């Protein structure tokens, strides 16, 4: 897929501009972030979740606001670079990586019989 690069000066909203993006590679190309295909292949879900996390931490970004339009590019680059410099196990983007031990639930016989 050929991706049109992101332009903060576009008349489209961010949602409209990103409507056709379907992969992590599309997002990185859209935001002009150079990437190593191997890193993206192994970490695509982690990169996209981290990007989402960074946008969430940035607060309520009005997609028509010029500042918001400039804030999304560094978030995409930072999300990708997190996994160039580290790995999924270290970054712990998803809850399953943050769990130290298996979750155990004890149900007594009395609870079962009541």
Swiss-Prot record:
What GO terms describe the biological role, i.e. biological process, of this protein?
nitrogen fixation
Keyword set, alphabetical order: Nitrogen fixation
Q: Does the keyword Cell membrane apply?
A: no
- Residues in the signal sequence: none
Q: What job does the chain carry out?
A: May protect the nitrogenase Fe-Mo protein from oxidative damage.
Tell me, how does this one assemble?
Homotrimer; associates with NifD.
Q: Which family does it belong to?
A: Belongs to the NifW family.
Q: Which protein, by its recorded name, is this? A: Nitrogenase-stabilizing/protective protein NifW
Q: Please report the organism this UniProt entry assigns to the protein.
A: Azotobacter chroococcum mcd 1
Q: Which gene encodes it?
A: nifW
């Amino acid at each position: 897929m050929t991706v049109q690069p992101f332009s903060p000066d576009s008349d489209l909203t961010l949602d409209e501009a990103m409507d056709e993006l379907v992969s992590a590679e599309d997002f990185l190309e859209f935001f002009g972030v150079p990437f190593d295909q191997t890193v993206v292949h192994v970490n695509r879900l982690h990169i996209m979740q981290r990007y989402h996390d960074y946008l969430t931490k940035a607060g309520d970004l009005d997609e028509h606001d010029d500042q918001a339009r400039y804030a999304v590019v560094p978030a995409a680059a930072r999300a990708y670079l997190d996994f160039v410099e580290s790995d999924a196990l270290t970054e712990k983007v998803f809850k399953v990586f943050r769990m130290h031990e298996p979750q155990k639930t004890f149900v007594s016989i009395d609870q079962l019989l009541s």
